[in-house]
């Protein structure tokens, strides 16, 4: 079965045609429209049109609280124009093919559970480091949606109790690529070292730049603390780290090392019998959302 698959993010829409062997063809990306749902549908339809007759349906993952069964976006995430509105139905009417939608983090978790780093796990999670932090929980061998479709929304968790309203205390602002680059800006003189991208930051890390290595470790310590908290709460076997920067081996290595450090000297208020989870890289990396969206469509039929 060939499907048109969309991974809708806050900055870009990744797309491809995918078949049951998970081969991705005609892949590309375009900027995500930010003005209206109508413009959003226009872009999706224009991307689908060249594949009409080839792709028999549309599988899509997107940010927000997604009611997959009814094709509704209850919370729009970065795309506020989708909040509280139907997405699958109107898009299906315009394209004339079935449309299935799901949350992006849950799609990543499904991809890794069915055919990736979490295969065979009963209780596990993906931790997707991007503009924010995406999550998807596997509980008792199934993807956990939650009572209101909000399970795994790690970005909204707080790191301190100082000010709930301060976005700078959220996991999404601190433990994301956004947070990593913000940390770099705070510790590096911008007059001599201008704003850099994630790729440029890791070029410095891999070249052995001392300050960049310190910044990375500080960032990974925060991520490791959140993974430790999730493990204490849910008794997770594995946590698969994904997102664009997960392709950097030193990121995964440093998160593991920081988690080892936490468990080796946790302080007095900690039971040494508490298990430490295994940290792995998502098999599908930044493609996990696309693969999971395909699986979601097939399993929903």
Give short role names for the model-derived ranges.
Residues 23-24, 73, 143-144:
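Hydrophobic "anchor" residues
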Residues 71-84:
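A charged helix-plus-loop insertion that forms the helical arch/lid used to bind
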Residues 104, 130, 293:
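Active-site glycine-centered loops adjacent to acidic/histidine catalytic or metal-binding residues
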Residues 31-33, 81, 150-153:
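A short acidic/small-residue loop/turn micro-motif
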Residues 119-174:
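Glycine-rich phosphate-binding loop of actin/hexokinase-like ATP-binding domains
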